[in-house]
């Protein structure tokens, strides 16, 4: 995993942990419910490292958390199927309403937004690893924050020319 991407993941997890600790700084001993929406399948290589970093940061902050990870498996399902699958899962989680949603990669963010599920607008959402965000749409969600990996087109073109 490139150092820049790993630094970005660590930064967003720090932002995420800070958000969840600020959301309810009155009682950190209360268990927080965290929903993680991943774009790919469960065994995608980067996910294990991300879990380790998040668990470590939550422990350091003294935050007790119940983490539920949902995997869109975007390479197996169409965008419509991903959106429907996510909407159904969010409905199933209605008795376990998350305190915060962490979204990883473009497909997961797009599926959440396009699902139009009420939770997408009512709970804090932190996104990361997004390359092509739809900024005008994201601005309609005041509960969403995060970072995206802005493509360096000039550098990519130079690389293509060298190849």
Question: How would you name each of these model-derived features?
Answer:
Residues 2-10, 22-163:
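Short hydrophobic alpha-helices and adjacent helix-cap/hinge residues
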Residues 13-21:
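Hydrophobic h-region of N-terminal signal peptides that target proteins for export
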């Amino acid at each position: 995993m490139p150092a820049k991407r790993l630094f970005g993941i660590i930064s967003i997890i720090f932002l995420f942990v800070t958000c969840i600790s600020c959301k309810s700084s009155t009682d950190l001993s209360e268990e927080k419910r965290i929903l993680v929406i991943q774009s790919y399948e469960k065994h995608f290589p980067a996910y294990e490292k991300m879990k380790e970093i998040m668990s470590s940061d939550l422990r350091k902050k003294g935050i007790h958390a119940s983490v539920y990870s949902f995997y869109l498996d975007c390479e197996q399902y169409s965008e419509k199927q991903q959106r429907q699958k996510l909407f159904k899962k969010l409905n199933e989680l209605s008795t376990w309403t998350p305190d915060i949603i962490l979204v990883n990669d473009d497909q997961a963010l797009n599926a959440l937004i396009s699902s139009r599920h009420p939770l997408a607008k009512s709970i804090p959402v932190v996104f990361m690893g997004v390359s092509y965000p739809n900024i005008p749409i994201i601005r309609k969600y005041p509960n969403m924050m995060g970072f995206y990996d802005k493509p360096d087109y000039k550098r990519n073109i130079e690389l293509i020319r060298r190849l």
